[in-house]
Amino acid sequence: MNNVFVYLEIEGTTVADVSLELLTKGRKLANQLGCQLEAVAAGNNLAGIEKQVLPYGVDKLHVFDAPGLFPYTSLPHTSILVNLFKEEKPQICLMGATVIGRDLGPRVSSALTSGLTADCTQLEIGTHEDKKNGITYENLLYQIRPAFGGNIVATIVNPEHRPQMATVREGVMKKEILDENYKGEVVNHDVAKFVPETDYVVKVIDRHVEKAKHNLKGAPIVIAGGYGMGSKEGFDKLFELAKELHAEVGASRAAVDAGYADHDRQIGQTGVTVRPKLYIACGISGQIQHIAGMQDAGIIISVNSDPNAPINTIADYVINGTVEEVVPKLIKYYKKNSK
């Protein structure tokens, strides 16, 4: 009762990285609240799944194993969470802001009339004062996310209804194993008690999984371009520099919206979150929405003609100049010195 729950997204028999990241965060939240961390795994052929999950500090793993639970379809997974939560009454539920999470989260929160905050960039525990009614709420989940196009950061709380639900994008939270030998309880549930046969009305006939075009999230060096790159041709220069540095190329939302780069390269609150050892920002002003996706980089270098650009305030090094001037010089230098 009143524990922290994480819904585990599973591809085949492998737990998704975003779910493991949320287990890490969930463990920290549970420690602050003095409660347990529980996880829910629903799929097929899940024997031994606990080996992937318990090391993240999970006190109880709820397993639902049945042929109709993979590939994912909406109704069975919704019934599992709704009926389980009616029994267990969690205070917090976290899930990935993925295609599945964006489908499942609203269904569950609507069924439980609990509300949900999508695409959170931070999750914290705190106090909320309702000055109008003179009520103070302790130990609420602060669901923090950029709002109004990334121009402000909003802190959202849910004082009355439970569970407090939030989705988080992959890469926003850090994935850290707590203890390889962590001892947690594994509960294998009778799926039929939670899911009516009518929920299996949708059958997945075939699946086509598109391979990733790049490894932006895992790259040690990321070169990102903004609207200041001016054109697709400007981005070609970044790809040329990336080739010399064995880096990946990312983009700000403004650059993607302008058609300079593909959407799958977008870094920020509505794109990918990256934590490279080196991040080179070229022609990026540094709106809150973008900074949320790269602020944990080891070293940040900003190439910008505006000395007052917001991104310069978090950069370790600032090169004050136009990208048309600076980027070709970087390419020339590394071509000369990498041989």
Please state what every model-predicted region is:
Residues 1-339:
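N-terminal glycine-rich FAD/FM-binding segment characteristic of electron-transfer flavoproteins
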